[in-house]
Amino acid sequence: MSTGLTLALDGSTYAGSVAVIRDRDVIAERQLASVPHPGKSGKAENFMPMVAECLRDGQVRPSDLARVVCGEGPGSFTSLRVAASIAKGIAVGTGIPLYAVSSLLLIVARELRDDGMWLAVLPAMREEVFAQQFSVERHVIREVGPARILREHDLEQEAAHAGASLIGSSRGDATPHARGVAAVIDGILASGRCDIDSWEPVYGRLAEAQVKWEAAHGRPLSAAG
């Protein structure tokens, strides 16, 4: 079944990515370079031109798109917000639906994986990681439980207990990539579109600035005022 043209974005890491997908085939893709000073690569002035370049590479106009899919996190607070803002803007500007997908799922989905259990991880700072378990069988990827925050030094034990292979950018072997949307597009469509006005990324934890503010003031930021 044809699914038309999909624009996919992910900003869960500082190496943000974009892909244009026709049905289930990636026809163009781009990725920002991950840099030592993360604030520089997640900014809109870098991400938006990458989106435009990717559309141009695929010879696709925004008006040709059937939908936009955005990685929902967890991950980098700033980069997730940038990608989400761009995705929402394109959806509103073109009148197409917005869908969301787990960025941890995109780690597994970006390449063909052997059948079995996989524990996908992303850095969560403070010597912790975001982690979620997935099963792969005949190229079908399924979630096995929700995303969690684990301590880095518990990862090997956690994976061994689950009989899973570790994969993810905290280990330097994979990052989420928007191209992974092609492998899981059917599940994304089945999950339903997002309400553009209310949808926000799943950051996984409070922003570092908010943590510091609450520690200094002894109360939640939401209680300020």
Predicted regions and their residues:
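Short glycine/serine- and small hydrophobic-enriched flexible loop segments
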Residues: A52-E53, K88, V92, A183, ...
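DPxDG-like acidic metal-binding loop motif
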Residues: R67-L98
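N-terminal phosphate-binding loop and adjacent alpha-helix
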Residues: V35-R56
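Phosphate-coordination loops involved in phosphoryl transfer and adenosine-cofactor binding
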Residues: T3, L65-V68
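Oxyanion-binding and handling regions
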Residues: M1-E29, K40-N46, Y99-G225
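Phosphate-handling active-site elements
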Residues: R56-S63, A91-V101
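Phosphate/pyrophosphate-binding loops at sites that engage ATP/ADP/AMP, CoA/4′-phosphopantetheine
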Residues: V51-A66, V136, Q157-A164
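Glycine/charged-rich beta-loop-alpha catalytic/anionic-binding loops adjacent to active sites
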Residues: I27-P36, R67-C70
